[in-house]
Amino acid sequence: MDVNHFLISSLLERWRSETHTFHFPHGETTVTLEDVVVLLDLPIDGDVVTGPITVQDIFATFHEHLGVIPPPTVIRGNSIRVSWLNSTFQQLPPNANNEVIAQYARAYILKLIGSILMPDTSAARVHVMYLLRLANLNVVRNCSWGSAVLACLYRCLDHGIHLRQENIGGCMILLQCWAWESVATGIATGGRTEKIKWV
């Protein structure tokens, strides 16, 4: 889905970090956990999605959970390039055993986190702490991923207005779908509905 940059820019202009709400002429509104559940179907109850900010041996972590050791050129600090994940885990090998299937599943979820759900401003890197949360795929659904996505979006909106960034991180699909669903697109005037031009 393409992101409507004009819509996102207009929303960003109305964002207030003090209240984590958008200020419109008709009042304040914001993306809520309920919106995350309805629009993304992510769990909002369960274990907090958190982890260590630094990982002692990032190469060992990738080898343990993904079965490969990434080249040092794709790692910066405690994050890895999403493009490397895309190219390395493109096609599941035929006759893959359960361990390889789990490694590819972790890589796929990690790509989703880094490029769609909780991307940074570049949407090009993902933090290794999320890989640690994916270690046991049987309990991944027990984490409050929706809360993490919403917190990341709020933080990215805050940074977007305070740091005057060119690009903004966070789940833009959530923000855009929420705007289409929640922000008034029409008003009743004399029995008919007219479009509001607020963007």
Each language-model region and where it sits:
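N-terminal leader regions that mediate targeting or early regulatory function
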Residues: 1-154, 170
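Extended, charge-rich alpha-helical regions
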Residues: 81, 85, 174-175, 180-199
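Helix-loop junctions that connect tandem helical modules in alpha-solenoid scaffolds
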Residues: 98, 159-160
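Generic N-terminal leader/processing signal
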Residues: 109, 165, 193-195
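Flexible helix-coil junctions and inter-repeat linker/turn elements that act as hinges
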Residues: 118-122, 162, 183-184
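Acidic, serine/threonine- and proline-rich low-complexity regulatory regions
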Residues: 160-168
